[in-house]
Amino acid sequence: MANTWRLDIRGLDGSLVLIVLALITIGLVMVLSSSVAVSEVRFGHQWHYFQRQVFALGVGGLFAALVLMVPSQSWLQHRGKWFLLGLVLLALVLIFGREIGGAKRWLPLVVMNFQPAEWMKIATILFLAGYLQRHQDAVKQDSTAVIRLFLPFGIMAGLLLLQPDYGTTVLIAGVLVGMLFIAGAPFRYFVITVLPIGAILAVLLINSPYRMARVMNFMDPWQDPYGVGYQLSQALMAIGSGGITGSGLGASVQKLLYLPDAHTDFMFAVFAEETGWLGVVILLSLYGLLLWRMFAVAQAAWLPQAPFKALVVYGVAIMFAGQLLINVGVNLGVFPTKGLTLPFVSYGGSSLMMALLAIGLVLRIDYETRLIKGHSTEELSANPSFGS
């Protein structure tokens, strides 16, 4: 039953769907609010970024619907092909990609720009989950099983850093370490994994004046609030001015071309300004519920001899948690600017589409787990409230 291409939507996790819909709704409202000024200046009307986000939502919803129909066994069988596709796309973006803000990260398509790094996150999770299932005993006992991962992930990291995209590289490294930990790899293997990655990133950071300026900026943005510290200082002023209840939806001052990237990397600052700490608590609570539900799905899907499905869900949860932590940390001045979006909320077509695809994977795995545990499609049909 679990490998069927059929699906009864009444067997889906209703709470998980509602949480995602709530985040998407907040995202659409905030994309419209935070982008009106920059959209008016760049394109002559206020709706440009909102319309593109709605289009991405439609495409992402289609992706999620298609993924819901695909048995997880199919993703396991073709995990290597999906990872290879990601590497090819990362290579193509270096040749044919569109450069924005000094980084070449987007492939220009007919109707939109696509960021291959977003797909690479999903492909990495699928590939690593399959690898850890196939070599689960070796990973716990033999360090070479972990070292072998350096070749494919080293190639991927190299392609990402050439764009350059340090944020995605750090995020995927975190997903790699987290999934290894969940798979039962000994602590000493994390030293083998983390130290080389940290050393390489440190060398690249030191040799990049632009990146070093970002590090110095987040350490003390007020030292040069009109120079390298301008973006972060404006973000902090936005967050601080929101108070408890905020200035009201649409009433942000910083989004009026004072805060660069107000609709993308720094949307959290605009959200805090307009909704206050009350809104921030609600938003973070929704993310907390999302992660809690995904960890519950992963725990239920765990099979000692076949942990692929559980590891995929854990990987998606770690990915979302990492993006949330880094994005909020950047807005608060805890981390240097990384260029990672708030899942489902920040403007970004590729990010939204791939986030919905990832949720489709989680929902499919949860659906299969319910079937395996004795709830047939007929039982689900007889009890429409099941899974809500």
UniProtKB/Swiss-Prot annotation:
* Single GO cellular component term: cell division site
Its predominant location is membrane
Give the record's keywords alphabetically: Cell cycle, Cell division, Cell inner membrane, Cell membrane, Cell shape, Cell wall biogenesis/degradation, Glycosyltransferase, Membrane, Peptidoglycan synthesis, Transferase, Transmembrane, Transmembrane helix
- Taxonomically, the superkingdom here is Bacteria
- Part of which pathway? Cell wall biogenesis; peptidoglycan biosynthesis
**EC class name:** transferase
Checking PANTHER family in the record gives: CELL CYCLE PROTEIN, PEPTIDOGLYCAN GLYCOSYLTRANSFERASE FTSW-RELATED
Name this polypeptide is given: Probable peptidoglycan glycosyltransferase FtsW
User: Where does this protein come from, organism-wise?
Assistant: Thiomicrospira cyclica (strain DSM 14477 / JCM 11371 / ALM1) (Thioalkalimicrobium cyclicum)
Report the gene name: ftsW
